[in-house]
Amino acid sequence: MKSLIYISYFLLSLTYISFGQTTEIIKPLKENITNSNKTNVSTFLTEKKWNELFPKRYGIGIKDSINNISDFYSFKTFVQVAKLFPSFVAEGNDSIQKRELAAFLANVAQETSGGWKDAPGGYFKWGLYFLEEDSASTTKSYNDTSKKNYPGIEGKYYFGRGPKQLTWNYNYGQFSEAWYGDKDTLLQHPEFLSKDPLLSFASALWFWMTPQFPKPSCHDIIIGKWIPNAMDTIKGRLPGFGATVNVINGGVECNNEIDFQKTKYRYQYYQYFCKYFHISSGDNISCSSQKPFGQ
């Protein structure tokens, strides 16, 4: 019997494991960047709307002195990367597609938010403000030595970078396989995510679209494709925005008697984007009563 493990999405990189034998079919994501691909993102978003939603985003209006790049989180880059994931904002009816877009934007906005309660323009205008985690976190290596297939490199730091704030050596290694066709590039150079806007956005969409057992993909959750099993139901894991939070940061933000303020902002971001796209937020927005996946 064969089991299928997704290394990337949409058959771009697959690993089949059968009777102890492994065969890889790899077509690196970066080789699929063309202008001929299409994405539904442009159906619901324009550059003008992007500027309205993210007026404080990293690098807008100025050139990053380190990377020599203006507007790191540009709408153009987001659309270009979305074309690599043709099922993103493409399955179900318009309401489901807009709900997925709202859920994705809510999570990346909160992951990178520079806002505070009385921030100019309001808290929700400060999404995509940060490129990397705050300085207090960048002293941690985020190297999980139990993940033997993706060994971290001494002196390298796998802290959060990019829209999703990709973290941990095993995530860098898996995404490196999907993007470059090998795990070593980003394990050796995790800082690349802070230098290349395409790579940075791709890391976020790769994470969103890719299931990592025992977690389903955020994409499958929000479009209603993921069906909880009996244990999921017992543990409170139900379809909805809350389960995407569980996938992203369940060990910290879920199953808490009192939600952290950042978790409340994450839920509120989702409602903010749903309102912007004129759709309902659906059921099970919170993960407060959900056990993290794997527990």
Across the structure, where does each feature detected by a protein language model lie?
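Short, well-ordered loop/turn and helix-capping segments at boundaries between secondary-structure elements
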Residues: Y172, T210-P214, Y276-I279
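Hydrophobic, mid-to-C-terminal alpha-helical segments
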Residues: C218-H219, N229, T233-V247, N255-R266
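Amphipathic alpha-helical surface "interface" segments used
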Residues: I222-R237, S288-Q295
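Bacterial Sec-dependent N-terminal signal peptides
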Residues: M1-T22
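Surface-exposed patches in mature extracellular/periplasmic domains of secreted proteins
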Residues: S87-L101, K117-G121, K215-K225, S281-C287
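GST-like fold's C-terminal all-alpha helical module
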Residues: W206-P228, G240-F241
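Low-complexity, Gly/Ser/Thr/Pro-rich intrinsically disordered linker/tail segments
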Residues: N246-Q295
